[in-house]
């Protein structure tokens, strides 16, 4: 006669649950840890590519009055997840605007492609990190921050259209992109130290 299996002890379930939780946390940590070394160089290298991509214009540009202001104090956060989401959103908008087929002829296309590839790779790494951290955190991203960023980039697109995608209008956008890379540097530097 077979001996009936003894029922599993409740502590056994607790240990199993704890093991699974620790494994999930370790996966999340490893998915995000690879960003730390990249954070240190991403903005600096991107700024260098942006500078190399768009040499100085042969003519002086008139002062453009683009009403695309952005209150950068809205970006202040010590929450790594929120900083990652914000950085991801900014990079998606930068990628979209800089990959436009109407960029000026004097821009170095290979440098622009290198910058776009860099943005794309970093965005993918952020997506992996955000996807893995979704398993343990469901904090909501401030909607007004998302809308403010979206409104700013929409304004830049309109500005380009209104100025017929002129080289001077693109110079204004390039300067805005420079400011965004500096914001990203501050976001990632403040939350991963």
From Swiss-Prot:
Q: Which residues form the signal peptide?
A: 1-31
Q: Enumerate the UniProt keywords alphabetically.
A: Antiviral defense, Cytokine, Disulfide bond, Glycoprotein, Secreted, Signal
GO annotation, biological process: adaptive immune response; B cell activation involved in immune response; defense response to virus; humoral immune response; natural killer cell activation involved in immune response; response to exogenous dsRNA; T cell activation involved in immune response; type I interferon-mediated signaling pathway
Residue positions with a glycan:
65, 71, 108, 186
Q: Has UniProt tagged this entry with the keyword Disulfide bond?
A: yes
Superkingdom, natural source: Eukaryota
Pfam families recorded for this chain? Interferon
Q: Which InterPro entries match?
A: 4_helix_cytokine-like_core, Interferon_alpha/beta/delta
Q: Provide the Gene Ontology terms for cellular component.
A: extracellular space
SUPFAM superfamilies registered for this protein in UniProt: 4-helical cytokines
The disulfides recorded in the entry are 32-129, 61-155, 68-168
Could you confirm whether the keyword Transferase appears in this record?
Answer: no
What are this entry's molecular-function GO terms?
A: cytokine activity; type I interferon receptor binding
Localisation: Secreted
User: What's the family?
Assistant: Belongs to the alpha/beta interferon family.
Described purpose of this protein according to its UniProt entry = Has antiviral activities.
Q: Give the protein name, as stated in the record.
A: Interferon type A1/A2
This protein's species is: Gallus gallus (Chicken)
Gene (name only): IFNA1
